[in-house]
Amino acid sequence: MRDCCHQKSISSIIVALLSLPMSNFVAHGQQGTPAEPIDVETKMEFALRGQREAHAIKYGDWRKFCFQTPGAKTVCRTTISGKWETGQSAVRVDFIEREGEDAARLQLFLPVGLYLQAAARLTVDQGKPFRIPFVWCLTNTCIAGDRANPALIRQMETGQQLKLEVADTNLLSVSTMLPLSQFASVRKAAASRIFKQEVDE
């Protein structure tokens, strides 16, 4: 019984987070403004000391999950996760959409130990990078998120690879490449799983 209640509690938290309006997720100072492409050379407020690739990360397939709560609009998450060879979670990218709304949100779950002022940067193939600011950190993960720029969405749907760049605390640029070949088809398809949250009377 205790395990059952614990699982319901976790499910409630997940649904509650995904049910918040998109504007509630936007970082302070960026409300209502989607991530814009940046010129890294001119907009960087600090000097990176070098670069390195992230340790080997194995990515799974893109998947789509939807969350339904009575009296609220359905929220769907098209997501991909990557793990290190140890099996520990390394990266998760969520593309979040709410039924009936044009705005979408990109949310990145990343390891701790990063230089948060640098923000995360997403680049599709050889395009310009889009800046995704960090929103908050927990004990074992840091979360970056912002409204998804329509141009970035179009690039993700037609591109082949998504480059994710962050800066570590040594001011080294760290990057990893995520596959995009399945993104568009998974996003437009039916959800592979639907979570229904009942409201207690």
Where does each model-flagged region fall?
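Intrinsically disordered, low-complexity regulatory regions of eukaryotic regulatory proteins
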Residues: 1, 22, 34-37
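Bacterial N-terminal signal peptides that target proteins for export
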Residues: 1-14
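Well-ordered, non-transmembrane segments within structured domains
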Residues: 2-3, 18, 129, 133
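Short, low-complexity disordered leader/linker segments with a strong preference
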Residues: 4, 23-29
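Bacterial N-terminal signal peptides
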Residues: 12-23
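A generic "folded-domain core" signal
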Residues: 28-201
